Amino acid sequence: MESFMGQKKTLYACYFLMLVFFLGFNCVHGRTLKVDDKINGGHYDSKTMMALAKHNDMMVDDKAMQFSPPPPPPPPSQSGGKDAEDFRPTTPGHSPGIGHSLSHN
């Protein structure tokens, strides 16, 4: 009887440790987000250019460096076509399901 209780206690301890260990692993499927470089628009500021120039052993004056202003952001497109990246939330109870599209507008 003693060995059965010892095995049961060991089994519960292993189960508890596995539960704690695997608690951090979550299987989550989600929509990947597109990362755009909207912080600096692809242009470097003068401090970054000075650091790059000093790194390359170039002598650059602040006054000699002329930067053009960044181009204006493009206007948002108003396309009516469907794309694979379109996202339209549905009301509860009216989900189209996998492989089906919303055709009843």
UniProtKB/Swiss-Prot annotation:
Proregion positions: 31-85, 101-105
GO process annotations (BP): cellular response to nitrogen starvation; gravitropism; lateral root formation; negative regulation of developmental vegetative growth; nitrate import; primary root development; regulation of root development; response to ammonium ion
One annotated Gene Ontology cellular component of this protein: apoplast
Signal peptide per UniProt: 1-30
Posttranslational modification: The mature small signaling peptide is generated by proteolytic processing of the longer precursor. Hydroxylated peptide is more active than non-hydroxylated peptide.
Tissue: Mostly expressed in roots, and, at lower levels, in stems, leaves and flowers. Present in lateral root primordia (especially in vasculature and in the basal meristem). Predominantly expressed in the phloem pole-associated pericycle (PPP) cells, and, to a lower extent, in the adjacent phloem. Observed in lateral roots (especially in vasculature), root-hypocotyl junction, leaves, inflorescence stems and flowers.
Family: Belongs to the C-terminally encoded plant signaling peptide (CEP) family.
Name the record gives this protein: Precursor of CEP5
Phylogenetic placement of the source organism: Eukaryota, Viridiplantae, Streptophyta, Embryophyta, Tracheophyta
